Amino acid sequence: MQTQERYDRIEQLIRDRGWEKAAAQIQKEIDNAGMLCLSENCDNARMWESYADGGRGVCLEFLAWDDAGLTFFGLHSFNITYSDSREYNLLRDPWEQAKTIVLTKSPEWSYENEWRIVLRNRLGQCTVGNILFPPEFLTRLIFGKNVDEVTKVAVRKWIRAGRCRPALYQVQSIGPIFSMTQID
Protein backbone atom coordinates (compact mmCIF):
# COMPACT_ATOMS: atom_id res chain seq x y z
CA MET A 1 0.00 0.00 0.00
CA GLN A 2 1.40 3.38 -0.99
CA THR A 3 1.93 6.10 1.59
CA GLN A 4 -0.74 8.39 0.14
CA GLU A 5 -3.23 5.52 0.16
CA ARG A 6 -2.52 5.00 3.85
CA TYR A 7 -3.03 8.68 4.60
CA ASP A 8 -6.28 8.66 2.67
CA ARG A 9 -7.42 5.52 4.47
CA ILE A 10 -6.65 6.96 7.90
CA GLU A 11 -8.41 10.23 7.06
CA GLN A 12 -11.46 8.25 5.97
CA LEU A 13 -11.38 6.18 9.16
CA ILE A 14 -11.33 9.31 11.28
CA ARG A 15 -14.23 10.81 9.32
CA ASP A 16 -16.29 7.60 9.40
CA ARG A 17 -15.80 6.18 12.88
CA GLY A 18 -13.48 8.44 14.76
CA TRP A 19 -10.11 7.82 16.24
CA GLU A 20 -10.84 4.25 17.40
CA LYS A 21 -10.36 2.82 13.91
CA ALA A 22 -7.19 4.83 13.37
CA ALA A 23 -5.86 3.61 16.71
CA ALA A 24 -6.74 0.03 15.72
CA GLN A 25 -4.71 0.40 12.51
CA ILE A 26 -1.73 1.66 14.52
CA GLN A 27 -2.12 -1.24 16.96
CA LYS A 28 -2.18 -3.66 14.01
CA GLU A 29 1.17 -2.30 12.86
CA ILE A 30 2.59 -2.83 16.36
CA ASP A 31 1.14 -6.35 16.63
CA ASN A 32 2.72 -7.34 13.32
CA ALA A 33 6.21 -6.11 14.22
CA GLY A 34 8.99 -7.88 16.08
CA MET A 35 11.21 -6.05 18.53
CA LEU A 36 14.57 -6.69 20.18
CA CYS A 37 15.61 -4.39 23.04
CA LEU A 38 19.30 -3.67 23.65
CA SER A 39 21.34 -1.35 25.86
CA GLU A 40 24.48 0.67 25.24
CA ASN A 41 26.03 -0.35 28.55
CA CYS A 42 26.68 -3.55 30.46
CA ASP A 43 27.69 -2.05 33.79
CA ASN A 44 24.39 -0.93 35.29
CA ALA A 45 23.49 -2.68 38.56
CA ARG A 46 19.75 -2.05 38.11
CA MET A 47 19.79 -3.75 34.74
CA TRP A 48 21.75 -6.78 36.01
CA GLU A 49 19.18 -7.09 38.79
CA SER A 50 16.11 -6.71 36.57
CA TYR A 51 17.10 -8.25 33.27
CA ALA A 52 19.71 -10.82 34.28
CA ASP A 53 17.92 -12.45 37.21
CA GLY A 54 19.97 -10.77 39.90
CA GLY A 55 23.27 -11.44 38.14
CA ARG A 56 22.48 -15.08 37.30
CA GLY A 57 22.16 -14.31 33.58
CA VAL A 58 24.48 -13.30 30.78
CA CYS A 59 24.95 -10.17 28.71
CA LEU A 60 25.61 -10.37 24.97
CA GLU A 61 27.64 -7.60 23.38
CA PHE A 62 27.11 -6.95 19.69
CA LEU A 63 29.26 -4.88 17.38
CA ALA A 64 27.26 -1.73 16.75
CA TRP A 65 28.50 -1.41 13.18
CA ASP A 66 31.14 -2.90 10.93
CA ASP A 67 33.99 -1.17 9.11
CA ALA A 68 31.63 -0.07 6.36
CA GLY A 69 29.38 1.60 8.95
CA LEU A 70 26.57 -0.94 8.62
CA THR A 71 24.71 -2.64 11.43
CA PHE A 72 23.62 -6.21 10.97
CA PHE A 73 20.08 -4.94 11.51
CA GLY A 74 20.46 -2.25 8.88
CA LEU A 75 17.94 0.56 9.04
CA HIS A 76 15.89 -1.23 11.67
CA SER A 77 17.90 0.06 14.69
CA PHE A 78 16.44 2.95 16.64
CA ASN A 79 17.61 4.85 19.70
CA ILE A 80 14.88 5.21 22.33
CA THR A 81 13.57 8.71 23.05
CA TYR A 82 12.97 9.39 26.73
CA SER A 83 10.18 11.91 27.11
CA ASP A 84 7.03 12.62 29.11
CA SER A 85 5.46 13.98 25.94
CA ARG A 86 3.76 11.58 23.56
CA GLU A 87 2.10 13.40 20.73
CA TYR A 88 0.22 11.49 18.08
CA ASN A 89 -1.17 12.66 14.80
CA LEU A 90 -3.75 10.14 13.66
CA LEU A 91 -3.47 11.44 10.10
CA ARG A 92 0.14 10.29 9.85
CA ASP A 93 1.20 6.97 8.41
CA PRO A 94 0.22 4.16 10.86
CA TRP A 95 3.70 2.61 10.72
CA GLU A 96 5.33 5.93 11.64
CA GLN A 97 2.84 6.30 14.50
CA ALA A 98 3.59 2.75 15.68
CA LYS A 99 7.33 3.53 15.69
CA THR A 100 6.72 6.66 17.76
CA ILE A 101 4.79 4.61 20.30
CA VAL A 102 7.33 1.77 20.65
CA LEU A 103 10.38 4.05 20.53
CA THR A 104 9.35 6.45 23.30
CA LYS A 105 9.70 5.74 27.02
CA SER A 106 9.33 7.73 30.21
CA PRO A 107 12.49 9.57 31.36
CA GLU A 108 12.63 7.34 34.47
CA TRP A 109 13.97 4.58 32.18
CA SER A 110 16.76 6.69 30.67
CA TYR A 111 19.43 4.83 32.67
CA GLU A 112 18.89 1.94 30.24
CA ASN A 113 20.33 3.83 27.23
CA GLU A 114 18.13 1.59 25.13
CA TRP A 115 18.10 0.80 21.45
CA ARG A 116 15.40 -1.22 19.77
CA ILE A 117 15.54 -3.28 16.64
CA VAL A 118 12.08 -3.16 15.08
CA LEU A 119 11.34 -5.59 12.28
CA ARG A 120 8.22 -4.82 10.30
CA ASN A 121 6.16 -7.70 8.97
CA ARG A 122 6.03 -7.25 5.22
CA LEU A 123 4.61 -9.81 2.85
CA GLY A 124 4.32 -12.44 5.57
CA GLN A 125 7.92 -12.21 6.81
CA CYS A 126 8.52 -13.67 10.24
CA THR A 127 9.26 -10.98 12.82
CA VAL A 128 9.26 -13.11 15.97
CA GLY A 129 11.41 -15.96 17.19
CA ASN A 130 15.03 -16.56 16.29
CA ILE A 131 16.61 -13.98 14.00
CA LEU A 132 19.97 -14.87 12.47
CA PHE A 133 22.88 -12.45 12.59
CA PRO A 134 26.43 -12.62 11.23
CA PRO A 135 28.55 -14.45 13.86
CA GLU A 136 31.24 -11.77 13.84
CA PHE A 137 28.77 -9.25 15.28
CA LEU A 138 28.65 -11.07 18.65
CA THR A 139 31.86 -9.73 20.19
CA ARG A 140 31.58 -10.45 23.91
CA LEU A 141 29.60 -12.60 26.32
CA ILE A 142 29.57 -11.50 29.95
CA PHE A 143 28.61 -13.94 32.68
CA GLY A 144 26.76 -12.30 35.56
CA LYS A 145 28.32 -12.26 39.01
CA ASN A 146 26.01 -15.04 40.24
CA VAL A 147 25.99 -17.39 37.23
CA ASP A 148 26.35 -21.02 38.29
CA GLU A 149 28.93 -23.39 36.81
CA VAL A 150 26.30 -25.53 35.06
CA THR A 151 25.20 -22.48 33.07
CA LYS A 152 28.78 -21.50 32.24
CA VAL A 153 29.57 -25.00 30.96
CA ALA A 154 26.41 -25.06 28.83
CA VAL A 155 27.09 -21.62 27.33
CA ARG A 156 30.70 -22.50 26.50
CA LYS A 157 29.49 -25.71 24.84
CA TRP A 158 26.99 -23.75 22.71
CA ILE A 159 29.72 -21.31 21.69
CA ARG A 160 32.12 -24.11 20.68
CA ALA A 161 29.36 -25.77 18.62
CA GLY A 162 28.52 -22.57 16.75
CA ARG A 163 30.32 -20.04 14.58
CA CYS A 164 30.44 -17.15 17.08
CA ARG A 165 33.69 -16.60 18.92
CA PRO A 166 32.98 -13.88 21.46
CA ALA A 167 35.43 -12.97 24.19
CA LEU A 168 34.19 -14.33 27.54
CA TYR A 169 34.09 -12.18 30.65
CA GLN A 170 33.01 -12.69 34.25
CA VAL A 171 31.47 -9.91 36.34
CA GLN A 172 33.39 -9.56 39.60
CA SER A 173 31.50 -6.68 41.17
CA ILE A 174 28.36 -4.78 40.20
CA GLY A 175 28.18 -2.01 42.75
CA PRO A 176 29.26 0.44 43.85
CA ILE A 177 32.02 -0.01 41.24
CA PHE A 178 31.44 -2.35 38.30
CA SER A 179 34.29 -4.68 37.39
CA MET A 180 34.74 -7.72 35.18
CA THR A 181 37.64 -9.83 33.97
CA GLN A 182 38.26 -11.77 30.79
CA ILE A 183 38.14 -15.51 31.49
CA ASP A 184 38.91 -17.18 28.15
What role is predicted for each listed range?
Residues 1-184:
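Partner-binding and oligomerization surfaces adjacent to conserved cores of proteins
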